[in-house]
């Protein structure tokens, strides 16, 4: 049998794939070793433990999320950029549903790179909000509200809420929610 050229990135990619099949909480060194057809101790050449794998996966996901958000927002008006952020964030969360929780482990790790990437994500929203001539405090609050609302909707969806209820789909509710949040920016008196 040929020796596999194992890398940290391959382990991260396998973690994402396995999480989609067996659930993130079931991904372990033995499961990863089985995936690669190797013995589990070989993984210790790349990571000390599963917590390091989870953090590396979180960094990978946050980088990809920031890339997708930035490219979705570039060249748009501030309002359109925020809408693109919301839609791109939701698509990302749906694509990576099995590992979505990892982009929210920033304060549980002590990882400077992950913290920096999370702040970059926040800056994308705050920079767009600067165009609405808000006070620093309003920018801060609206940024938190916007990101919290998106995360809440995604989390509740992943928990099984928002299933088809009559003739209203979760996509319609998401669009309504984003429209309502952004409409307040169009009329500063509502803020």
State the predicted function of each range.
Residues 33:
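The alpha-helix within a helix-turn-helix
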Residues 5-16, 20, 25-26, 37, ...:
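An amphipathic alpha-helix adjacent to DNA-recognition modules
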Residues 57, 61, 65, 85, ...:
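Hydrophobic/aromatic residues within well-ordered alpha-helical segments
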Residues 30, 41:
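Residues within helix-turn-helix
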Residues 1-6, 189-191:
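N-terminal intrinsically disordered/low-complexity leader segments
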